[in-house]
């Protein structure tokens, strides 16, 4: 699928319905795919990546996993093992409102990864969190089933597919 977030923004800049949204430019690129898109699945967790692991171990089917880590910079929610699982299981990308680790390994994975920062400290494993719930990422509503488009210029969301 070919797209450019700038073109999507040009086409939808007057959409005041809330169906088209743009995440703030705070996410860094860590993955092996500079551009990715797909329907959204959601994990909400705080410094515990147990549900992230469960998600990426399941078939991704071209989806994008949005991880609401509350913007925490204290623990890494995704590392090399989880990124490799995401690539192996067909996830298009991961957007983490939090940290990642194993940066060289992430870059080698064929999956898009955006996150706030790198942090070498791993998470706790308490099986806490929620899946497939609406979340607020950096002040922007993200819902399961939204479409997410990410490239070098940014990340946009829509309630419906915008490509094709």
Predicted regions and their residues:
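Feature captures the catalytic cores and cofactor-binding loops of soluble hydro-lyases/lyases
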Residues: 1-144, 161-164
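Mixed-charge, glycine-accented linear interaction segment located at domain edges/termini
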Residues: 143, 147-158
